[in-house]
């Protein structure tokens, strides 16, 4: 696949990299100091535990975690300032793609570390970057779909829907019974993007973005069905879809105020803070009436990369190898309600048991927003569309913003 990146930005980054100062150091007692920079504030405590264990087992290496607010922006700033951390943990996003294309990460293509993880998730990284080289090791994955309240489903005699028509029929039955079918939380624009991700991956697919990069297709041509169905879902929300945010939704759903919640696996722990005894289930959003085509939206929540300029690549690899040990991977995904990229490590939480067959069968598709540059402003664009309901205007805006970003990156 042809790379789509800013020639200007990549060139500047390459020049900076060649003159970059490195983060790793060795103190007077010959202890190697490594900086681990990661972007998830909710994962800081989990990584602190693992780092403490690693440091104890490796007295000649000391890993220190850095986890700033707005981490991706901070990381890009640090690249410009020639201060790339030794080890980086981040999502497989457009930011990762740009940084990988610029050459700041160590090439791990033939490294034994990759043998510990499922190759399907390595391919996800290659798809995002458009590169054959592998510059990150998938560590943890998240998933998006529909969380449902098992007690409400049982009370209303509802079954898990397998097709789009069944999903709408299930929502209608809940509505007829006086139960909110879906608790939407569109006050937060990123929440409005969740159905777009789920349906875009299943109905359109990831190959669309390869073709869009090459100007072979458009959102206007490919995303009509996604847009129409996302509007249809709005008929089964509550009275204040755009007045409630993510935290409101977690509280409401935890208190049994809705049957279903289009959400990510990251919300499970938040819902349980409200109601530890709630019985939850999880299923992929069935975007079509062909059950065999239903895929689970799942992507690399955290990948592990090493600076190409670190003074201590072998010690950095030791830390990555440690994190990829099954025991440590299991500890992390259990605490974070995530899924592991490590072969043989499974999420055992009963609430997500319905998703495991999709992982096992490889019936997963990446989050489509991983392929959309942040400058396109997808989230507020989707949010505005759901309010004004102008399908053609919405898709036209996505195409125009995409083309603007492409032009800037090509200059």
Name what the model sees in each region.
Residues 173-174, 213-242:
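Glycine-centered hinge/linker elements that transmit conformational signals in sensory
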Residues 1-34, 56, 113, 344-347, ...:
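Short, low-complexity disordered leader/linker segments with a strong preference
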Residues 91-144, 168, 174-176, 195-197, ...:
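Hinge/lid segment of periplasmic solute-binding proteins
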